[in-house]
């Protein structure tokens, strides 16, 4: 089975890459900066991103399953970039005959979502928009907890500096955290 992993330099992508290398798959990575990856003889690397259609189509060529772990949060126009990225990916995946997209998105209700979470939901909707031509599996996770994750480090820092904290009455955010190892396991479970 030929698998494409996008977002291989990210928090989840780095861990998923290591797990996929232990599986019986042919692994290809689409990355902007190949120099930032650990060299591995068992992976094929395509340099590019979802805005470079030639590189994107090359990366998806011959692929059975593609992991979509892309998010443009660093850019102030991230909502529009996320939408364009997802649409480009979906179009190229269909054109190249990919059978399945696996997307890791956020957990929440669209009507109550923050702008950031709404962007993640809209990305999932775009990737799921053509079920007759491609299967999309949408894993929706809350706060991902694990050593090195932004959420984990914020919580760890707060508990070290402020072991007891009084919060205002309006602080009522509910969260459903999930361990990073569980996210990776679910991502692997839906591979085949």
Task: Please annotate each region the language model reported.
Residues 25-32:
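Conserved glycine-rich Rossmann-like NAD(P)H-binding loop of the short-chain dehydrogenase/reductase
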Residues 111-140, 147-157:
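Active-site Tyr-X1-5-Lys
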Residues 157-178, 182, 186-190:
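A conserved pocket-lining segment of Rossmann-fold NAD(P)-dependent short-chain dehydrogenase/reductase
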Residues 6, 30, 69, 101-106, ...:
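SDR active-site strand-loop-helix element
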Residues 95-100, 132-134:
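A short helix->loop->beta-strand "cap" motif at the edges of active sites that frequently abuts
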Residues 3-25:
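N-terminal Rossmann NAD(P)H-binding glycine-rich loop of SDR-like oxidoreductase domains
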Residues 35-98, 106-112:
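NAD(P)H-binding glycine-rich loop region in Rossmannoid oxidoreductase-like domains
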